[in-house]
UniProtKB/Swiss-Prot annotation:
GO terms for cellular component: mitochondrion. Its main location: mitochondrion. Keywords: Mitochondrion. It comes from the Eukaryota. Residues 22-44 are annotated as: Disordered. It is found in: Mitochondrion. This is Uncharacterized protein C146.02. The keyword Mitochondrion applies. The keyword Mitochondrion applies. Residues 34-43 have a biased composition (Low complexity).
Length: 263
């Protein structure tokens, strides 16, 4: 039984003829007073007669406060108390009384009741109408969501997210400023050094200056924005296409030398 008292079966008193609780004293008196001609009626009377002790025992059992057959069980069960007659206080050890018919809405209000004891002081009728009303499931969901949004853990998560977003924005701004400064510094590069390295000394001065400036601008700009921007250049684009065409993508049969026009 594990210390748990289960509710026994209800008393079946409708079939009185099969009852074996017969008062013996009344039986003897009836037998002495009855004649032999009244034996049939006497046996019928005995079969319908129940002992007074059995009636008193049943009455006491029904009126006992711990009786499982107690008709007024709402006085002893905290889940069946009337909502209008009580209120939650600091000294109340019980949760608010929730009817068994409303248990499917009880999960929305248990945490709210435990957290709001001694803080708001509203009655059970308003608590029922706000959190345990079967006619407003959307309002229940909104109330639970609002409580979750006001939690301290949620505020901490929001602060962490805002900090991360601010850091990403700062990094993006710094990368943009670096790219802009690199583009402005192209005018001050040493052209002669770059032209000698590229083998442009033999060209005419006019072409050498123009070509070196363009080549130097391209190389410096590419190195400045490497890894920080999604800009693509024609030279890198053609190299990537040639590499991808010969990767040997065996999982796509027949696509080893596909023309990568989509790149």
């Amino acid at each position: 039984m594990n210390g748990i008292r289960k509710k026994p079966a209800t008393l079946q008193l409708h079939n009185i003829k099969t009852s074996c609780f017969i008062d013996g004293s009344d039986d003897q008196s009836d037998r002495t007073r009855s004649s032999s001609g009244d034996s049939t009626s006497n046996s019928l009377k005995l079969s319908h007669h129940i002992s007074d002790e059995l009636i008193n025992a049943i009455y006491k059992e029904l009126k006992s406060p711990v009786s499982p057959w107690d008709k007024n069980i709402s006085q002893h069960s905290p889940w069946l108390l009337e909502a209008a007659s009580n209120s939650i206080g600091d000294s109340s050890p019980l949760l608010s009384p929730i009817s068994p018919l409303k248990l499917r809405f009880h999960k929305y209000s248990v945490s709210k009741q435990l957290n709001s004891v001694g803080k708001q002081g509203f009655g059970l009728s308003s608590n029922h109408s706000r959190y345990a009303s079967p006619s407003s499931p959307a309002r229940l969901a909104r109330g639970a969501l609002g409580e979750e949004l006001s939690n301290s853990q949620y505020r901490l998560e929001c602060a962490a997210i805002q900090k991360l977003v601010a850091q990403k924005r700062a990094n993006r701004r710094s990368s943009k400023s670096t790219l802009k400064n690199s583009a402005n510094d192209i005018e001050f590069f040493d052209i002669e050094e770059v032209s000698s390295r590229k083998g442009l000394i033999d060209r005419t001065p006019s072409k050498r200056n123009v070509t070196s400036r363009v080549s130097d601008a391209y190389s410096r700009l590419k190195s400045a924005v490497k890894g920080e921007s999604s800009l693509s250049f024609k030279r890198n684009r053609s190299k990537s296409k040639r590499k991808i065409q010969h990767l040997g993508l065996t999982e796509f049969n027949g696509w080893e030398h596909h023309q990568c026009d989509w790149l």
